[in-house]
Amino acid sequence: RKESSAASDVYKRQINDSEPAPKFNIVERPNTWAKAMKKTAALSETENLKLAFWEKFNNEAPKHSAFIREFKLRKPQAQHWYDLGLGSSAYHLCMTLNTKNNCLSAGLYVNEDKDIITRFKSNEELVSKILGIINPNEIEWRLDENKKASRFLILHPMGDMNDKDNWDNGCAWLCDMCVKIK
């Protein structure tokens, strides 16, 4: 016996004397455009801004050859962070978008091994020099003994994050800083 819906057919199937069981036959699969539109419609204004910024980043990053040689882009998400692998599960690069403070950041996120960040911190002046930071206080160090993860990050003021004219500059800064950190 067959019953039909828009996305699948359902058959009643019985083998020998067993109890009848439903058998689903998928006849229509959701299309990715419709899924993307549905997902976007459910996002808040801030989430849409974050998604649009990371999409812009993915479009701008290939223009920066040093960045593209070092990193693999990932699918943009409606979240405040965008992670880049560095070939180790112990740490990764993390870029963030802070819509409240209107700034970007790039830094190293270490999952558990606090010694990694401690070694960087003990060479703070050298780290600042390599990253092209004049004032070492521009590096924010987050070493909390009560948390597993630790990190350092560099902040970049953006003005109004809603002003998309600022985004090219922000994307270029992120690409440059990530290459320097690596």
How would you describe each model-predicted region?
Residues 24, 33-34, 54, 79-83, ...:
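Tryptophan-centered motif/residue detector
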Residues 9-39:
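C-terminal helix of von Willebrand factor
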Residues 39-158:
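Polyanion-binding interface signature
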